[in-house]
Amino acid sequence: MQDSKEKQCLIFVRNNANDTADRIEAYAKKSGMEVVETVFNTDKKAGERLRYYIERDVIICVLVRDVVDISMELNEIKAVMTLAAEHGISINAESRGYEPALISYE
């Protein structure tokens, strides 16, 4: 049986970023991924939703325009990226050509 999360991704974008969401969704579909949800970062619940998907291992990656779309706070970005890494989930940024974003522990 094929792993159900094999090609599933989550799109996480800033509030009112409909054009960005559409562009990233088109990239995901072109790359053969299934978008399980597009989350707009409008409030604290958006971050909770992001963590929900990561902690349940239902996706292989999170697609963002840039990692600062996750949060403007560096510690929050690092916490989310660390959680994702612990679950084998990459955070891929459009600004990096959809390469996985890397975290610095300095």
Q: Which sequence ranges carry the predicted segments?
A:
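Short, structured surface patches at the beginning of a domain
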Residues: 1-106
